[in-house]
Amino acid sequence: MGIFSNMRKPKGKLGNIQLKSMNKEHTPLALWNLKHLDIKPDDIVLDVGCGGGININRMAEKAKKVYGVDYSIESVKLSREVNRDLIGQGKVEVLEGDVQSLPFEDNTFDIITAFETVYFWPNIEKSFGEVKRVLKPGGTFMMGMESNGSDNIPMKISKKLIDMEVYSDDELTGFLKANDYSNITVYLRDAKNREEIIKANGEVKRIKDDYDHASFSDKFLEWMTITAEK
């Protein structure tokens, strides 16, 4: 399996290397995504498509317990390794599973996150419905992506090399509305102008964004975080 095709579902030694690299390279984006999430001490959190497990580790600093799920066994193994101590403390659990059939009861989680992973979800509208099933009433679903749509050169190249779909904020909002999510808020980061664009309740506002970004962030002009409630 080639380096690009392996990104969808990391396998073997190459997958392990890629996952460790993503833990590092995606950090600026992930920390920006997490700025828009209010994790409380009693929250039970699920990270879908947990990859290398670093975001599980970050959220476990605030939450009561964090679960991770991924359909890549290599991701599950590395996530367990990264969070070994927290697993031993009972604060983290990592499982193999698929977003279309999550191995949890209805109304289980206060927060569900998806960092850099919805690109690979089959039947995304159905997947959003499955996320909603295991989310508690009033719970929050948060997605983090490095690009708002594919109308930029880096994402156009990525789509050709990797089997992935890059969605715009309007498309994702539409899928959420089709599943009756509420209080949908879109946060877009305009790195060029150092502004954050916030879309909510039919209104758009811009605020100054002084987020201290690494050079990695400048590959994409518009990071995106979307939050929605059940």
Task: Kindly give the residue locations of the regions a language model identified.
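Conserved alpha-helix/loop element of class I SAM-dependent methyltransferases that forms part
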Residues: 24-43
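Class I SAM-dependent methyltransferase SAM/SAH-binding core
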Residues: 46-101
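A short acidic, Gly/Pro-enriched loop at the edge of an enzyme's catalytic core
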Residues: 100-111
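A short SAM/SAH-binding and catalytic strip from SAM-dependent methyltransferases
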Residues: 111-124
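A short glycine-rich, Lys/Arg-flanked "PGG" loop and its adjoining helix->strand segment in the class I
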Residues: 125-137
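Conserved beta-strand signature within the Rossmann-like core of class I S-adenosyl-L-methionine
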Residues: 139-145
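Short, glycine-/aromatic-enriched active-site segment of Class I SAM-dependent methyltransferases
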Residues: 146-163
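Short alpha-helix
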Residues: 164-180
